Amino acid sequence: MWRCPLGLLLLLPLAGHLALGAQQGRGRRELAPGLHLRGIRDAGGRYCQEQDLCCRGRADDCALPYLGAICYCDLFCNRTVSDCCPDFWDFCLGVPPPFPPIQGCMHGGRIYPVLGTYWDNCNRCTCQENRQWQCDQEPCLVDPDMIKAINQGNYGWQAGNHSAFWGMTLDEGIRYRLGTIRPSSSVMNMHEIYTVLNPGEVLPTAFEASEKWPNLIHEPLDQGNCAGSWAFSTAAVASDRVSIHSLGHMTPVLSPQNLLSCDTHQQQGCRGGRLDGAWWFLRRRGVVSDHCYPFSGRERDEAGPAPPCMMHSRAMGRGKRQATAHCPNSYVNNNDIYQVTPVYRLGSNDKEIMKELMENGPVQALMEVHEDFFLYKGGIYSHTPVSLGRPERYRRHGTHSVKITGWGEETLPDGRTLKYWTAANSWGPAWGERGHFRIVRGVNECDIESFVLGVWGRVGMEDMGHH
């Protein structure tokens, strides 16, 4: 390390000019505007001192990273246009800096006062009294490092930044974007309906419900930051099944809000709910269309009460129900109540699920969502190991429910065949493949084949004629 005695200060301008004259021509460093002239100053930073670095004359490698730029600890930096590190004068020359100290912290070319804040994705950074930033260290739902690792890892699917998730922590994603409570042991042990393939019956290698039943399979909705996948997936499957089983005479998009607000027995609305309770309500009480009772979009309201139920019905005989209230949406007059028959559980064999789906329509599936699923952009999803070496708080999962709409196969570059399900999520059309995703089939990936439900829409001849 070189330190300049105070007696040599008068020679410093001359040393700077000599160093400049020794160069052949003028390089980028000479032509660039000085850091401090651009207002890039961090008087509280310890740069030269941290590295014990002071250099004579001009030494372009006597440099350090500095607020997105480069600063120097050599005598040449102290020319008319200065690019010295902020502690150069104090540490190397033993004199006060020629620039007034900043009362605050620098970020993005802007000065923040002490206790001022800015957000770095999901983490809040606060300016401390020592003029240094202190940032939270929460795992973010959108993790650029994880996106990069997945896309470079050849896992068979692509990751990306879903803008609606930017700024959310991973914990918030698990709490607000899922919402299906894992069924009790008694429900998980409910009797399975086994579907038997006929002798010689061969299922197609690819199937999509929207191709067999055009205009009867509804597009995904967006649950927002409401932990209500239990209501959204139930309403989605019931909507398609009622449309299919009525032969297209009834094509409602059923209301998740009707379930969220009115199915309150052991249910928690936007704080989570159970699938068995949702299907009981649809069978015994029924719901109206989403146009009649639209989603209110309440988000992250953990402390407040659930929106009150604004739709009620009465028995008409033979199990049918009739609405006793007008639509919450005053622009809609049709308040018809839609119901289903008792829900049934399918076997976990993928062939049984495929046959049921092809004959009767989309099915509902429980699944475990891991931290990387939120980043899904396209391809055939399987949970990746990219977070295995990180602390446990970066490896989170929760229970979700979705609508399976079809299946297919894809030939990999090495010649292997990869089988997959196609499914509709409830995170809106901007997520994944237009609101849908593909996931590996036949190996119970993320438990998606462990608890699969089907149901029949309650449709009578009077319904067919009425509609």
Curated annotation (Swiss-Prot):
Highly expressed in aorta, heart, placenta, kidney and a colorectal adenocarcinoma cell line. Moderately expressed in skeletal muscle, pancreas, lung, lymph nodes, adrenal gland, bone marrow and thyroid. Weakly expressed in colon, small intestine, ovary, spleen, testis and prostate. Predominantly found in vascular smooth muscle cells, but also in cardiac and skeletal muscle cells as well as kidney. SUPFAM superfamilies: Cysteine proteinases (SSF54001). It is found in: Secreted. GO terms for cellular component: collagen-containing extracellular matrix; extracellular exosome; extracellular region; extracellular space; lysosome. Residues 1-21 form the signal peptide. GO terms for molecular function: extracellular matrix structural constituent; laminin binding. Residues 50-98 form the SMB domain. Glycosylated. Keywords: Disulfide bond, Glycoprotein, Secreted, Signal. May be implicated in the adrenocortical zonation and in mechanisms for repressing the CYP11B1 gene expression in adrenocortical cells. This is a non catalytic peptidase C1 family protein. This is Tubulointerstitial nephritis antigen-like. It comes from Homo sapiens (Human). The gene is TINAGL1.
